[in-house]
Amino acid sequence: MAEEILNREYEVEYEGRKYFLRPVKAWVLQPPGKPGVVVALFKLPNGKSIRKVIMRLPP
C-alpha cells in the first residue's frame, strides 16, 4: 500500500495554484481513540515543502 501511495500523483493547491505532484514521503497519523489519516509531504517546483492529508482511514 505504501508504494501505491508514493507512486500516485495528487492534486495539491498552494497560493491559488494547482500542481499534480508525487509525494516525497507519507505516514499515518492516528491519535488514540480517533480515526487515522495519511499525511504526505510534497516538494513544490519553487523549492518549498508542504504537507497535505491525502487519505482518511476507517475507524
Curated annotation (Swiss-Prot):
It comes from the Archaea. One of its GO terms (molecular function) is double-stranded DNA binding. Its main location: cytoplasm. This is Chromatin protein Cren7. Methylated at multiple sites, to varying extents. Coiled coil: none annotated. It is found in: Chromosome; Cytoplasm. GO terms for cellular component: chromosome; cytoplasm. A chromatin protein, binds double-stranded DNA without sequence specificity. Constrains negative DNA supercoils. Keywords: Chromosome, Cytoplasm, DNA-binding, Methylation. Belongs to the Cren7 family. It comes from Pyrobaculum aerophilum (strain ATCC 51768 / DSM 7523 / JCM 9630 / CIP 104966 / NBRC 100827 / IM2). InterPro entries: Cren7_sf, dsDNA-bd_Cren7.
